UniProtKB/Swiss-Prot annotation:
Membrane topology value: Peripheral membrane protein
Recorded GO MF terms: ATP binding; ATP hydrolysis activity; proton-transporting ATP synthase activity, rotational mechanism; proton-transporting ATPase activity, rotational mechanism
Protein's name in the database: A-type ATP synthase subunit A
SMART domains: AAA
NCBIfam families given in the database record: PRK04192.1
Record organism: Cenarchaeum symbiosum (strain A)
EC code(s) of this entry: 7.1.2.2
Length: 592
């Protein structure tokens, strides 16, 4: 029996209704004559507190509230890829057809096109035993995505009694019948799943495979693993959104879920305009063919921001269960936390630090704990991952505020954006002294097996140079660079070269926007070798001025833009030229 009550109190997106004794926590309800979508977030006796996902303008006490009997759920099936949804999985294209440029209230529409036909290829036969997660067949969703039709995780399983033959079917067709205890349960191409409930998996693995983003400062110095968690905190204008766009564009994942949570609408427009024209570097297909957008911009209802995060991560888990690597980018979790703060204030809860609710930390933990690299349920055996990257927008760039400090407890990769670097035109403005990665030891084996055995040692040497330069900066500030010996002046010179030739990256340059792991390693190795050979040359009597005047320095700084990923021999030639020029300075062969 569904709950039926009446509105007694309205305060912004929060509504109180009585006569709701039949309602359940987190049940979806329709509110008012306009049938606005809402969710029960607190029950006191027969009074329900409801957060409404649409504008409550014009609602008045006495209007009806009706329960649906179901929690807030998303529809999972073919047709999700390439869509742009609002926070509760309503496709914005369909909403614009119904209500024009401004979204009307109380509009409901199907998240995917139920009449579109897909070519289904069955992978089980009549009489086969199936369990939750078993793949019964596949359809081609886009040129990049083979979509597995799976037995839902909450299904009882059983024996296949009937299955359709290969052919074209729409989403409402019964694809299979599964018999269990004398009952036949029909299975369609889609099913629904509650957004607040994590999807089940068989086994969770340690994150040992790096997520290659093509951004040198991330992949080389502060890597993130597939199935890992990362955060990009930064104040206004530090380049959070462009950095997240770069990760969404170039990360080596099969699916990208991009959640615009409370940010400017123009940023989502940028993604919509750019992605269809950009090609996936591995498949040469449009990036929109692997992307799902959840747009909940700053002028949309506040309550739907919270839902948008859960909607996005549930879609990500669904594709993970197919055995795909998924990257979920949330921009920004601070706006989500602000939505929690606003709802908490409306409900008159006791505020904690800076007005945020006391359960902020547990909500952040719930979100980040849904990341991971797993073996999916059922057969065939397949591994997938969900990597979560959240932007944090601390007001005034203050990293001690609650959202940043709580986020740091639950993530292992922290990319701290620095306003000073951004204002000096150093992008991505990731501060190499404040950032860290907890995945370095886990993924070093992959780099050793796939790129170079000495990758970790080379990376440590390069990072050591940057750390020493940071300590020397204080002396230089007080006494000037002339107070340093030549060996330390060389450290300053090589650190400057690393910042320009390695750490800086132009996301708008066709060559430099993406850097392959092999090119990253060779650029890194050349910088470290330049330093080692410089130290050796100084010991053998060479002048620092001669080292600074070497023509190869210009080549080292420009190699990131001049040499493409498929032109690795040119980098070897550059290393050879560096060798020869050092020989010319010292007059003897320098040991490598």
């Amino acid at each position: 029996m569904t709950a039926r009550g009446k509105i007694v109190w309205v305060s912004g997106p929060a509504v109180k209704a009585d006569g709701m004794s039949e309602a359940k926590m987190y049940e979806t309800v329709t509110v008012g004559e306009a049938r606005l979508i809402g969710e029960v977030i607190r029950l006191t006796g027969d009074v329900a507190f409801i957060q409404v996902y649409e504008s409550t303008s014009g609602l008045k006490p006495g209007e009806p509230v009706e329960g649906t009997g179901n929690p807030l759920s998303v529809l999972l099936g073919p047709g999700i890829i390439g869509q742009i949804y609002d926070g509760i999985q309503r496709p914005l294209k369909e909403l614009s057809k119904k209500s024009g440029s401004f979204i009307g209230r109380g509009i409901t529409t199907s998240p995917v096109d139920m009449t579109k036909k897909y070519h289904f290829v069955p992978s089980v036969s009549v009489g086969d035993d199936v369990i939750p997660g078993t793949v019964i067949g596949t359809v081609k969703e886009t040129d990049l995505i083979d979509h597995s039709i799976m037995v839902p995780p909450d299904h009882a399983g059983g024996k296949i009694k009937s299955i359709v033959s290969e052919g074209e079917y729409d989403l409402e067709t019964e694809m299979a019948g599964i018999e269990k205890d004398g009952k036949t349960i029909p299975l369609k191409m889609y099913h629904r799943w509650p957004v607040r409930q994590p999807r089940s998996y068989h086994t969770k693995y340690d994150p040992t495979v790096p997520l290659i983003t093509g951004q040198r400062v991330i992949d080389t110095f502060f890597p993130i693993a597939k199935g890992g968690t990362g955060s990009i905190p930064g104040g206004f204008g530090t380049g959070k959104t462009v950095t997240l766009h770069q990760i969404a564009k170039w990360a080596d994942s099969q699916v990208v879920v991009y959640i615009g949570c409370g940010e400017r609408g123009n940023e989502m427009t940028e993604v919509l305009v750019e992605f269809p024209h950009l090609k996936d570097p591995r498949t040469d297909k449009p990036l929109m063919d692997r992307t799902v957008l959840v747009a909940n911009t700053s002028n949309m209802p506040v309550a739907a921001r919270e839902a948008s995060i859960y909607t996005g991560v549930t879609i990500a888990e669904y594709y993970r269960d197919m055995g795909k690597d998924v990257v979920l980018v949330a921009d920004s979790t601070s706006r989500w936390a602000e939505a929690l703060r606003e709802m908490s204030g409306r409900l008159e809860e006791m505020p904690a630090e800076e007005g945020y609710p006391s359960y902020l930390a547990s909500r952040l933990a719930e979100f980040y704990e849904r990341a991971g690299r797993v073996r999916a349920l059922g057969s065939p055996e397949r591994n997938g991952s969900v990597t979560l990257v959240g932007a944090v927008s601390p007001s005034g760039g203050d990293f001690t505020e609650p959202v940043t400090t709580h986020t740091m407890r639950f993530i292992k990769t922290f990319w701290a954006l620095d306003a000073k670097l951004a204002y000096s035109r150093h992008y991505p403005s990731i501060n190499w002294m404040n950032s860290y990665s907890g995945y370095l030891a886990d993924i070093a084996k992959w780099w050793g097996e796939n790129v170079s055995k000495d990758w970790l040692d080379t990376r440590s040497e390069a990072y050591g140079i940057l750390q020493r330069e940071d300590t020397l900066k204080e002396i230089v500030r007080l006494l000037g660079p002339e107070a340093l010996p030549d060996e330390e002046k060389l450290i300053l010179e090589v650190a400057r070269m690393m910042k320009i030739g390695l750490l800086q990256q132009n996301s708008f340059d066709d060559v430099d926007t993406y850097c392959s792991p092999e090119k990253q390693y060779k650029l890194l190795k050349m910088q470290v070798d330049f330093y080692k050979r410089g130290q050796q040359a100084l010991k053998e009597g060479a002048e620092l001025a001669d080292i600074r005047a070497m023509p190869v320095i210009s080549g080292l700084l420009k190699a990131k833009m001049d040499i493409k990923d498929d032109e690795m021999p040119k980098l070897d030639e550059l290393a050879g030229a560096m060798d020869e020029q050092y020989k010319g300075i010292t007059g003897v062969k320098v040991a490598s």
